């Protein structure tokens, strides 16, 4: 395996109608997760970017997970932004990260629009028609050392520091548990 999406899709083939993720308000099947993620990935293709950071500013819920996978389907990497962290900390992360876009939902619209000029709303992304041909083209260009996500810590100096994690890093870690 060279891409974390292969794990998701393999699980979806085996357990299409089984619940993959739950939170206190929703549950999502593997099939729905793949479908929603591909819609997001298709919409993000308009950015014409690869291996670039895209921030995801949403509550910790099943929808945010499809945001992460959707970014990956687009050939880019995601950065989780906690909606409850202070705005100045988010701004410092954005100064370092320079994300090309921000995914959020309407619940966080005001904050999102104050942070970035290119904002995608989850609710709108769910109306996107999946372009499987374009997603396949992007996938064929991906390699295992491509970034999957960036994680920011507080940093000892008070300036957030980021670490980028590749598909290979996560695949190796997951394989270790088999």
Where are each of the predicted segments found?
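Conserved N-terminal segment of class I S-adenosyl-L-methionine
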Residues: 175-177
